[in-house]
Amino acid sequence: MNDAFTVDDLIACYERGVFPMADARHDESIFLIDPERRGVLPLDGVHVPRRLARSIRGEPFEIRIDSAFDSVVEACATARPGRLETWINTPIQRLYGQLFARGLAHSVECWDGEELVGGLYGVAFGGCFFGESMFSTRRDASKVALIHLVGRLIVGGYQLLDTQFITEHLEQFGTIEIARADYRRRLGRAWTAQADFYRLAAGATGAEVLQAISQAS
């Protein structure tokens, strides 16, 4: 696919359970992925490792929401040691920027002073949140961002957190793998639900986020 693939096409893809990827950062093509097995993180079964919970309570970073979306996507698209290639190319980056402009994409950011040291971004429709990518230049920064995201989704009334695939990194938090048919059933229910990404206050503490997760389990 090329520039003829629009942001409205992308929204339609999400609604039917398909997501975009590129082979490489400098490959302009977009491929649509519809895996037989899908990673999801059940919001009523999130596990926060004890050491990470202690760190989150200690407020190691300032958490900001949607303050530097483009910078988060750019950081996720940047090659780093251990991750020499990325699936985020320029057309995909542009499409997510358009979703953000419509209020349909969000970032959770970890800041140390005025330095962005970690974060994640994803797409929200109805009661669904599709986690797209995360990055970290400091220990635990992406994990802290994920836990703050989870707390925000729980408080906001979301029903589905789609991680696309399951990885060892995500598995430690309770991510599971489900069949395509099961995923589509869950997607259909959550898509029409009402949720509010901003229901949790922007300055919510780590303790408040952990409490929300605990109450949902």
Curated annotation (Swiss-Prot):
EC number(s) on file: 2.3.2.6
Stretch forming the signal peptide: none
GO molecular function per UniProt: leucyl-tRNA--protein transferase activity
GO biological process: protein catabolic process
Gene3D superfamilies, alphabetized: Leucyl/phenylalanyl-tRNA-protein transferase, C-terminal domain
UniProt KW keywords: Acyltransferase, Cytoplasm, Transferase
Compartment(s): Cytoplasm
Enzymatic reactions: N-terminal L-lysyl-[protein] + L-leucyl-tRNA(Leu) = N-terminal L-leucyl-L-lysyl-[protein] + tRNA(Leu) + H(+); N-terminal L-arginyl-[protein] + L-leucyl-tRNA(Leu) = N-terminal L-leucyl-L-arginyl-[protein] + tRNA(Leu) + H(+); L-phenylalanyl-tRNA(Phe) + an N-terminal L-alpha-aminoacyl-[protein] = an N-terminal L-phenylalanyl-L-alpha-aminoacyl-[protein] + tRNA(Phe)
Listed InterPro entries: Acyl_CoA_acyltransferase, Leu/Phe-tRNA_Trfase, Leu/Phe-tRNA_Trfase_C
Domain of life: Bacteria
The keyword Acyltransferase belongs to this UniProt entry's keyword annotation: yes
One GO location term (cellular component): cytoplasm
SUPFAM superfamilies per record: Acyl-CoA N-acyltransferases (Nat)
Pfam families per the UniProt record, alphabetical: Leu_Phe_trans
Task performed by this protein: Functions in the N-end rule pathway of protein degradation where it conjugates Leu, Phe and, less efficiently, Met from aminoacyl-tRNAs to the N-termini of proteins containing an N-terminal arginine or lysine.
Family designation: Belongs to the L/F-transferase family.
NCBIfam families reported for this sequence: aat
Record's protein name: Leucyl/phenylalanyl-tRNA--protein transferase
Organism: Caulobacter sp. (strain K31)
